[in-house]
């Protein structure tokens, strides 16, 4: 047998080999073939691409998919209202028949551009009464009949409406294209796909919330897959790992002054960090969002990439301002990348608690890297392994191996195989050469006990500190942020929100922004409504659709429109009409345009004569919030602050503010908001 020929492969139950076998250089000129050209190209890209091109291709596809989901599917959203069509305002009601619903309107300029047979929507101060047919025109009058019999509510609108009345060609406030439609159109796969397959996200959330989390199913599926491809998530799918690879390739390999040894106290950090995360979760505090792989990269790109995307593609004034919470998250994200200066993929090897979940799951693997007796101890596999998963005797550290198969592609004797774990045919001798790694001895046992103790104590301390400097939910005067529509009750919300920031990204107008330290560490990076910045669009329910843990329920649009986020409160001292400063109807117009009709006018500051009769021309129409209709969308606050505050400098803050709290919001774990509204109306 030629000593240069690879040994005959031994039989196995299955083989998972997909690496590109090592090819010896020949001293004789070789004809140029397509295969040799491909090998040359892969070699120029890098040794890991040449060794395991399948893995690198899968990594690239997953990373590009993550970026596509984040930067395209989640942005930009748009919705298109109906074209307003012709609007003729300034009409007065001349006659109205309650029985038939027929009415006559008159206008000083007459019925210009109107003719019998046309259909028009009758509108009072932005609120559409209904659609009417024009039955006749006489000089300055137009006669109308309703398309359908008027309801009691419509009759009341006609009887008590103060005008001015308008005739609209199209119904106001109608949207043929919704934000939610745009999301559904682009979501070939769910935008939160990578978040729901990070098992630490769902596992820690379920423990902290003491409830079932639907993404546990997805986490279970990926863990089952990784029984066959141990730590395959880390080696193939994780976009953070790929980004770290890119950082190490571009920067890390050029800066070697901070390099650390292969062995040290840090090699088991991921297990102790995982233990701390789970202990904190048992204490009712969710900290996995700080350190789990996918939330880290999602939030990092949100606070770094999304402002650049919005500023360049839209306008820089549309980028929300940053605060201390943003800085903390950005530093954490950059710190994860900077660990590569200590050692390539330091985070993935030694720190990542999501990877630790898969390492523990590796104990149940059915496949494994094996080394045959034909191994010549060349050390190439040890040098190229990205996860330090190969011992000095060239056998495998099974809890660290990701089956990336890079080692198989550099083995000159093709001694490495990826087969069932119980395959023991013709294997290399263990501990040859000596590894210096022994079974758990006294020192190892003490190290394990110490590290575990630190993990448990650290998790408990974090839980206690977070609760101590937290939301203070029992204090009625504590800060209560307005949460997204469909948010579960606040205690459960804080336990279920993973702080991934996905809901911020899909919010079309940046209504949802990251909370700072208003609720201490407990509320850090949780989504809150910033109504001074923008209001919640009535045609958008995207935040609930992308939430990976159910902290924000995925509501149908009809349910979302009646889910109360908070209640608009008018500051009577600041409101311009209430304070008798000047007339203003900004909030009323915005509320009616959104279709909520939750703010109406009352007459205030009307002067009376000696007989107690109101003096004509005195007083103002001032806004009053109808608590049974207000959902706390915040568009009234946005308009008031934008015009009266920023543009006219009449106010330091909005005179109408959305506030959350008991009796002002709907926070339910399950059930219908529509039925809740119906029950309240009875």
Q: What are these language model-derived features?
A:
Residues 1-393, 399-400, 405-682:
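Non-ligating segments of multi-cofactor redox enzymes
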């Amino acid at each position: 047998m030629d000593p240069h020929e690879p040994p005959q492969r031994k039989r196995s139950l299955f083989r998972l080999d997909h690496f590109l076998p090592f090819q010896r250089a020949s001293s004789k000129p070789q004809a140029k073939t397509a295969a040799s050209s491909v090998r040359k190209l892969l070699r120029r890209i890098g040794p890991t691409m040449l060794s395991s091109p399948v893995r690198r291709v899968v990594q690239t596809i997953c990373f590009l998919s993550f970026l596509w989901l984040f930067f395209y599917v989640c942005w930009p959203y748009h919705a298109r209202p109906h074209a307003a069509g012709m609007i003729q305002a300034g009409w007065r009601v001349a006659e109205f028949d309650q029985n038939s619903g027929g009415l006559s309107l008159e206008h000083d300029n007459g019925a210009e551009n109107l003719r019998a047979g046309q259909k028009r929507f009758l509108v009072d101060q932005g609120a559409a009464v209904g659609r009417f047919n024009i039955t006749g025109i006489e000089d300055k009058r137009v006669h109308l009949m309703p398309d359908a019999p008027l309801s009691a509510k419509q009759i009341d609108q006609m009887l008590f409406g103060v005008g001015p009345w308008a005739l609209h060609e199209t119904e106001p406030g109608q949207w043929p294209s919704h934000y939610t439609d745009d999301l559904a159109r682009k979501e070939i796969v769910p935008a939160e796909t990578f978040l729901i397959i990070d098992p630490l996200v769902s596992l820690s959330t379920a423990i902290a919330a003491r409830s079932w989390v639907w993404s546990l199913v997805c986490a279970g599926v990926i863990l089952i897959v990784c029984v066959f491809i141990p730590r395959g998530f880390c080696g193939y799918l994780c976009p953070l790992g790929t980004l770290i690879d890119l950082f190490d390739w571009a920067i890390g390999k050029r800066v070697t002054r901070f390099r650390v040894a292969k062995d040290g106290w840090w090699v088991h950090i991921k297990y102790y960090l995982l233990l701390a995360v789970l202990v904190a979760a048992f204490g009712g505090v969710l900290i996995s969002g700080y350190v789990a792989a996918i939330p880290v990269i999602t939030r990092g790109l949100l606070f770094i990439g999304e402002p650049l995307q919005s500023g360049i593609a839209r306008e820089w004034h549309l980028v929300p301002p940053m605060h201390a919470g943003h800085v903390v998250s950005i530093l954490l994200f950059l710190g994860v990348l900077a660990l590569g200066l200590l050692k390539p993929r330091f985070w993935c090897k030694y720190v990542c608690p999501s990877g630790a979940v898969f390492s523990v799951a590796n104990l149940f693997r059915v496949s494994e890297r094996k080394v045959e007796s034909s191994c010549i101890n060349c050390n190439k596999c040890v040098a190229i392994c990205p996860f330090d998963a190969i011992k000095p005797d060239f056998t495998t550290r099974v809890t660290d191996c990701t089956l990336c198969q890079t080692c198989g592609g550099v083995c000159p004797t093709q001694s490495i195989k990826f087969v069932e774990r119980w395959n023991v045919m013709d294997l290399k001798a263990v501990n040859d050469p000596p590894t210096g790694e022994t079974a758990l001895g006294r020192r190892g046992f003490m190290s394990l006990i110490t590290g575990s103790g630190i993990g448990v104590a650290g998790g408990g301390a974090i839980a206690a500190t977070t609760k101590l400097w937290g939301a203070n939910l029992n204090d009625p005067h504590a800060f209560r942020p307005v949460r997204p529509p469909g948010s579960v009750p606040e205690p459960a919300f804080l336990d279920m929100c993973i702080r991934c920031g996905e809901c911020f990204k899909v919010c079309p107008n940046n209504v949802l922004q990251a909370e700072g330290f208003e609720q201490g560490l407990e509320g850090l990076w949780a989504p809150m409504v910033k109504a001074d910045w923008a209001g919640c669009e009535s045609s958008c329910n995207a935040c609930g659709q992308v939430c990976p843990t159910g902290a924000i329920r995925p509501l149908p649009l009809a349910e979302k429109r009646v889910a109360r986020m908070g209640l608009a409160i008018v500051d009577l001292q600041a409101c311009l009409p209430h304070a008798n400063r000047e007339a203003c109807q900004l909030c009323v117009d915005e509320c009616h345009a959104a279709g909520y009709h939750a703010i109406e006018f009352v007459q205030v500051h009307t002067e009376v004569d000696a007989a107690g009769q109101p003096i004509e021309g005195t007083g103002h129409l001032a806004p009053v919030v109808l608590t049974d209709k207000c959902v706390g969308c915040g568009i009234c606050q946005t308009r008031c602050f934008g015009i009266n505050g920023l543009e006219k400098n009449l106010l330091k803050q909005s005179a109408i503010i959305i506030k959350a709290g008991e009796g002002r919001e709907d926070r339910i774990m399950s059930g219908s908001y529509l039925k809740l509204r119906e029950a309240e109306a009875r």
